[in-house]
């Protein structure tokens, strides 16, 4: 599921990166992979209501709000909530992705940079530590799951990042995302 393009389909765009030398195999060699080009909209997948909307990133990127009954998850990867400022505005309407994440049970969000790193990478489409804490508070998320960490960060760096972030969240539970993590939304 990814943003529609006027020039190439999602499969073609993903195939560009999932191929040698960047990736050991080609997309065409992956079994049972289906690609869906999505426009900003709300649609249903079984019992799930999915809202997709554009979020701030140099390339077209969608954030998602997924609702089943009264449980809601927002998924925002490659997301820079407010270009070039250290803190998020107090007004949600000025903050990318806030409508998707407002009041969610679980916010799954990009956690790429420390504040110092972000200052050197404004406009790259990722968030800083302070922006992430501000955004989580602004939207009132109950739980935050971090992922999309900077690949140059060590485990110790990630531990420090999460310790600082946890002290800034004002009540939202923090979960460090790891492969195959399962989160019970109803808790």
Give the role of each language-model region.
Residues 1-87, 97-98, 156-187:
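Binuclear metal-dependent hydrolase catalytic cores
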Residues 82-178:
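Cap/insert and terminal regions of metallo-dependent hydrolase folds
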């Amino acid at each position: 599921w990814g943003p529609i393009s006027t020039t190439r389909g999602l499969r073609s765009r993903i195939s560009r990166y999932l191929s040698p030398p960047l990736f050991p195999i080609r997309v065409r060699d992956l079994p049972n992979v289906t690609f869906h080009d999505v426009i900003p909209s709300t649609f249903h997948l079984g019992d799930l209501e999915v809202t997709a909307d554009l979020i701030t990133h140099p390339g077209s990127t969608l954030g998602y709000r997924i609702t089943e009954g009264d449980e809601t998850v927002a998924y925002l990867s490659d997301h820079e909530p407010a270009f070039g400022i250290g803190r998020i505005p107090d007004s949600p309407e000025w903050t990318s992705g806030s409508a998707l994440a407002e009041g969610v049970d679980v916010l799954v969000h990009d956690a790429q940079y420390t504040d110092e790193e972000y200052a050197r990478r404004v406009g790259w489409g990722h968030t800083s530590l302070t922006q992430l804490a501000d955004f989580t508070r602004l939207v009132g998320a109950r739980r935050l799951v971090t992922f999309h960490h900077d690949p140059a960060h060590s485990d110790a760096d990630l531990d420090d990042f999460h310790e600082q972030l946890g002290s800034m969240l004002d009540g939202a539970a923090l979960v460090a995302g790891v492969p195959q993590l399962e989160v019970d939304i109803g808790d």
